[in-house]
Amino acid sequence: MKTKEINELTTAEMLDKEKSYKDELFNLRFQLATGQLENTARLKQVRKNIARLKTALRQQELNK
């Protein structure tokens, strides 16, 4: 997810996306532990997306 796409989302949508990414990260960690994860780069992508969302949320909070 690109920063431009994130900035176009509303606060509620950002929070929903963050929750879904956290759930996905949780599942990916279990797959990694059990040896079922094929695309290990997805872990990094999801973590980066969560960080981008948190940054955008904080920026919105400071701009208010």
Curated annotation (Swiss-Prot):
Q: Which GO terms describe its molecular function?
A: structural constituent of ribosome
Any Gene Ontology CC annotation: cytosolic large ribosomal subunit
Q: What UniProt keywords are attached to this protein's entry?
A: Ribonucleoprotein, Ribosomal protein
Q: Cite the Pfam families for this sequence.
A: Ribosomal_L29 (PF00831)
Q: Does the keyword rRNA-binding apply?
A: no
Please verify whether the record's keywords include Ribonucleoprotein.
yes
Q: Which CDD domains does the entry link to?
A: Ribosomal_L29_HIP
What does the record list as GO biological process?
translation
Cross-referenced HAMAP family, in alphabetical order? Ribosomal_uL29
Indicate the family of this protein.
Answer: Belongs to the universal ribosomal protein uL29 family.
Its recorded name reads Large ribosomal subunit protein uL29
Q: Which organism is it from?
A: Levilactobacillus brevis (strain ATCC 367 / BCRC 12310 / CIP 105137 / JCM 1170 / LMG 11437 / NCIMB 947 / NCTC 947) (Lactobacillus brevis)
